[in-house]
A protein has these predicted regions:
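Hydrophobic packing residues in well-ordered alpha-helices of helical domains and bundles
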Residues: 34, 133-137, 176-179
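Short, contiguous alpha-helical
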Residues: 55-104, 149-150, 154-202
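Amphipathic, well-ordered alpha-helical segments in soluble domains
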Residues: 37-44, 74, 78, 115, ...
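N-terminal targeting signals for Sec/Tat export/insertion, comprising classic cleavable signal peptides
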Residues: 27-55
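Short, helix-capping/interhelical loops that line the mouth of catalytic, cofactor-
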Residues: 16-29, 80-137, 161-167, 197-202
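Amphipathic alpha-helical packing segments from all-alpha helical-bundle domains
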Residues: 139-150
């Protein structure tokens, strides 16, 4: 009898494991965040003049144009990390390695908590026009939005490493959510630039 109970318990273990697939709620959360951040990005840039695009509060701070350029560059890099994770073998320790990080990302990224130096490959050069930024942003979002709406990959069990120790291992889903939340973070930065004394009126 004891052996039978143990055997049955072992058989049930896989059924008790957390499902690595997205729940309908998680997929909807991602789609909603992408839609909101896309609308907000376009609205933030729509009426910006060339003078406003290039104006910098200080030599060290980014202009509206540089923030917008950084967002475009970062979205491409971040979706590349999603693809890197998806193309990697499933991580058997994904639950332990990624636990609590979606909540942490949602807390620190959109709210601009913590400061970090941007990687060189996504530092703005200051030579991207508003029209180019909007075009590249929209093009990138066609791909990223279609991905999350259609994918059946169990995104949570595929991981890729973040260069910042505070994040370390992130799942493909967490890397994906990084995209809209990072954009929201820098849209707040754009709002700060616009609210700075000396920002051109036109």
């Amino acid at each position: 009898m004891r052996r039978t109970l143990i055997f049955n318990a072992v058989l049930c273990l896989p059924l008790l494991a957390t499902d690595a697939r997205l729940t309908p709620e998680e997929r909807e959360k991602a789609i909603g965040a992408m839609k909101t951040s896309q609308q907000d990005y376009i609205e933030a840039l729509n009426n910006v003049t060339e003078a406003q695009w290039k104006w910098k509060p200080t030599a060290e701070r980014w202009s509206v144009g540089e923030c917008a350029e950084h967002i475009v560059l970062a979205e491409a890099l971040l979706f590349g990390k999603v693809q890197e994770a998806v193309n990697s073998p499933a991580n058997p320790e994904w639950e332990t390695k990624t636990k609590g990080k979606i909540e942490f990302l949602e807390k620190v990224m959109p709210n601009r908590l913590g400061k970090a130096k941007s990687p060189l490959e996504i530092e703005p050069k200051g030579n991207m026009s508003k029209e180019e930024a909007l075009k590249l942003f929209r093009q990138g979002r066609v791909q990223t939005s279609a991905f999350i709406a259609e994918t059946q990959v169990p995104l949570k069990e595929h991981t890729a490493e973040h260069p910042f120790p505070v994040f370390n291992t992130l799942s493909a889903y967490q890397w994906y959510m990084y995209i809209p939340w990072h954009t929201m973070r820098h849209l707040k930065q754009i709002a700060e630039v616009k609210a700075t004394e000396g920002y051109p009126k036109d």
